[in-house]
């Protein structure tokens, strides 16, 4: 078969490399809340390495920093805001109840 007539070849598309979430100057520390909060979900869970796009070493340091911040109560262990939010209350209709004797 002729190599020039390959039916299933994909065209190569150029792609932009994403910027790393942690620059070389950033210190992964429990006090650096602006950095740590990027790696926590809305529920307060630590995001995975694939989602964060960080190296294994960086993920370990992030995890340790988040756990230290939780112990020192800089971060909450759980972030369940919905549990405590009150929904729109409907006004109760007060009706006079008659007692049956």
Swiss-Prot record:
Gene Ontology cellular component terms for the protein in this record: chloroplast; mitochondrial small ribosomal subunit
Short name of one Pfam family: Ribosomal_S18
Any single GO BP term: translation
UniProt keywords, alphabetically: Chloroplast, Plastid, Ribonucleoprotein, Ribosomal protein, RNA-binding, rRNA-binding
Taxonomy, superkingdom: Eukaryota
Stored InterPro entries: Ribosomal_bS18, Ribosomal_bS18_CS, Ribosomal_bS18_sf
Gene3D superfamilies assigned to the protein according to its UniProt record, in alphabetical order: Ribosomal protein S18
Region (Disordered): 1-23
Residue stretches of biased makeup (Basic residues): 1-19
GO molecular function: small ribosomal subunit rRNA binding; structural constituent of ribosome
Location in the cell: Plastid, Chloroplast
Family: Belongs to the bacterial ribosomal protein bS18 family.
PANTHER family per UniProt: 30S RIBOSOMAL PROTEIN S18, SMALL RIBOSOMAL SUBUNIT PROTEIN BS18M
Matches recorded under HAMAP family: Ribosomal_bS18
UniProt name for this protein: Small ribosomal subunit protein bS18c
UniProt source species: Draba nemorosa
Organism placement in taxonomy: Eukaryota, Viridiplantae, Streptophyta, Embryophyta, Tracheophyta
């Amino acid at each position: 078969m002729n190599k020039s007539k390959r039916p299933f070849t994909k065209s190569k598309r150029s792609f932009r490399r994403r910027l790393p979430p942690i620059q070389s100057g950033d210190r992964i520390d429990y006090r650096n809340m602006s950095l740590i909060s990027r790696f926590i979900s809305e529920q307060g869970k630590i995001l995975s390495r694939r989602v964060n796009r960080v190296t294994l070493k960086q993920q370990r340091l992030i995890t340790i920093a988040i756990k230290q911040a939780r112990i020192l109560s800089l971060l909450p262990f759980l972030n369940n805001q919905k549990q405590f939010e009150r929904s729109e209350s409907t006004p109760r209709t007060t009706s006079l109840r008659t007692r049956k004797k």
